[in-house]
């Protein structure tokens, strides 16, 4: 989901949680303040920052800026949200290493990744660089999230074997070429999914290109094709 709220201010939220296998909150524009179970006081998520909300972690949204925009990815997309009438946030405990089990018994840690602290490295696709959000490690490879920018070199045709491969265009433009498909010129606000083993190429990327890539699983193979 791409969520946009034009008028900010205090949010009349209650302590709640989601019965979900994986959930990402990426701040695209503006900022939002949130309380999380066992993570201390209010945390402000700025543009370029992200959270993952482990399964059933209690949380409450406090306040948001005008024009806040967030990208929310939940798996499954349709899931149950429940109110916790007994818990008060913040909790007295600070447990940054706590793990919340998913339906498969794998523990997931809360992640607050700050964009301004990013270190950029070569991406899995030639011609691009990426910042790893540590979500692959925190979820034991349930999911991976990277922010991608234009690097050096010419983009090449490649394919992947991830079960789910979703990308949101945050800034800039490029042409998405797919095997057996017409090319699409994509711009900020567009999104796409690439099926496993489909040959694609990100051609003619603008210098200001920035992509949000979300994959399940977090660890997968990419083959130049």
Regions from the PLM with identified roles:
Residues 1, 7, 80-150, 223-225:
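A short, N-terminal "cap"/entry segment at the start of jelly-roll beta-barrel domains
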Residues 2, 36-38, 63, 72, ...:
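Residue-level recognition of conserved beta-strand positions in structured domain cores
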Residues 2-5, 11, 16, 28-31, ...:
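A structural signal for the main folded, soluble domain(s) of proteins
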Residues 3-6, 17-34, 147-151, 159-177, ...:
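Short, conserved beta-strand element in jelly-roll/cupin
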Residues 38-56, 178-198:
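Short acidic-glycine-tyrosine-enriched beta hairpin
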Residues 50-52, 65-84, 141-146, 191-193, ...:
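A short hydrophobic beta-strand segment most commonly corresponding to one strand
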């Amino acid at each position: 989901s791409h969520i946009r709220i034009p008028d900010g201010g205090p949010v009349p939220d209650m302590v709640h949680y989601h019965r979900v296998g994986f959930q990402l909150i990426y701040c695209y524009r503006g900022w939002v303040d949130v309380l999380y179970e066992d993570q201390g006081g209010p945390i402000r998520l700025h543009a370029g920052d992200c959270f993952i909300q482990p399964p059933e972690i209690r949380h409450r949204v406090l306040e948001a800026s005008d024009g806040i925009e967030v990208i929310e990815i939940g798996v499954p997309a349709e899931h149950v949200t429940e109110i916790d009438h007994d818990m008060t946030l913040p909790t007295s405990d600070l447990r940054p290493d706590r793990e919340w089990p998913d339906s498969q018994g794998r523990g997931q840690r809360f992640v607050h990744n700050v964009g301004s602290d990013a270190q950029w490295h070569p991406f899995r696709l030639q011609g691009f660089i990426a910042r790893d959000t540590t979500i692959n490690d925190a979820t034991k490879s349930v999911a991976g999230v990277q922010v991608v920018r234009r690097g050096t070199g010419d983009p090449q045709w490649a394919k992947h074997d991830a079960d789910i491969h979703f990308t949101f265009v945050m800034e800039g433009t490029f042409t998405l070429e797919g095997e057996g498909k017409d090319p699409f010129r994509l711009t900020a606000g567009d999104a796409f999914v690439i099926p496993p083993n489909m040959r694609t190429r990100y051609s003619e990327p603008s210098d200001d290109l920035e992509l949000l890539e979300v994959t399940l699983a977090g660890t997968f193979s990419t083959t130049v094709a």
